[in-house]
């Protein structure tokens, strides 16, 4: 360390702490950020939607707005109806065991020939059902407008495989849970740290390993949709 200090132009014996660089270690006022989130009006929340759509367009991420669960269910059923399986002719869909997903009533909306699975902690065939499904439906607890990100938290009945394995990932997000930026998200996570693993998802899988050509779907979903549902309309 003494050599590094010398190279950086400091005394070899000078031990520098955080107090020497306050701007690097500035702490965020979590309480103030949470107060801002809690005080955001419904109109202000709706104002975040165009920001999300603008950010998503750069990431090949499709954003849909829905007024209520019925409209959201119709949108999702339409996506499934107009999509084809990538590797198999079987049309299977897997959805999280979540009350918001259940409110979509997809079993009554999907056409004949589409098999709908729901994740369950006691289902021994869950792995095979997930692999066989070309669409995975989740209900992330938070979304971020500025980075077009959804936060997927692993919970009982809500495995991360649903968002990672199927070729198409559809995320159902409540408008009330759409945040402005990552600063707000980190404030939420500091207040309510997840008990299990979680991932930030910003669009479909992307890689440019070969000849610097961008390819979607090599290591995960090739297509992603976020359906933002406004429950006040």
Description of each model-found segment:
Residues 1-233:
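The feature marks the mature, well-folded catalytic cores of soluble enzymes
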């Amino acid at each position: 360390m003494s050599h590094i200090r010398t190279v950086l132009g400091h005394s070899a014996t000078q031990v520098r702490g955080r107090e020497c660089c306050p701007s690097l270690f500035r702490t965020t006022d979590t309480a103030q950020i949470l107060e801002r989130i809690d005080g955001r009006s419904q109109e202000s929340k709706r104002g975040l939607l165009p920001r999300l759509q603008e950010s998503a367009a750069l990431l090949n991420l499709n954003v849909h707005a829905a007024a209520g669960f019925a409209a959201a269910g119709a949108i999702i059923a339409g996506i499934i109806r107009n999509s084809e399986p990538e590797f198999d002719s079987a049309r299977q869909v897997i959805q999280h065991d979540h009350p918001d997903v259940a409110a979509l009533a997809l079993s009554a909306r999907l056409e004949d020939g589409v098999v709908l699975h729901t994740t369950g902690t006691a289902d021994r065939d869950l792995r095979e059902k997930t692999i066989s499904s070309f669409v995975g439906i989740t209900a992330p607890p938070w979304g971020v407008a500025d980075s077009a990100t959804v936060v997927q938290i692993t919970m009982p009945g809500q495995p991360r495989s649903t968002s990672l394995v199927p070729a198409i990932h559809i995320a159902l997000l409540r408008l009330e849970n759409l945040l402005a930026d990552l600063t707000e998200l980190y404030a939420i996570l500091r207040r309510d740290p997840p008990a299990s693993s979680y991932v930030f998802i910003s669009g479909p899988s992307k890689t440019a390993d070969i000849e610097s050509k961008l390819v979607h779907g090599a290591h995960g979903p090739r297509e992603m949709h976020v359906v933002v549902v406004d429950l006040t309309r």
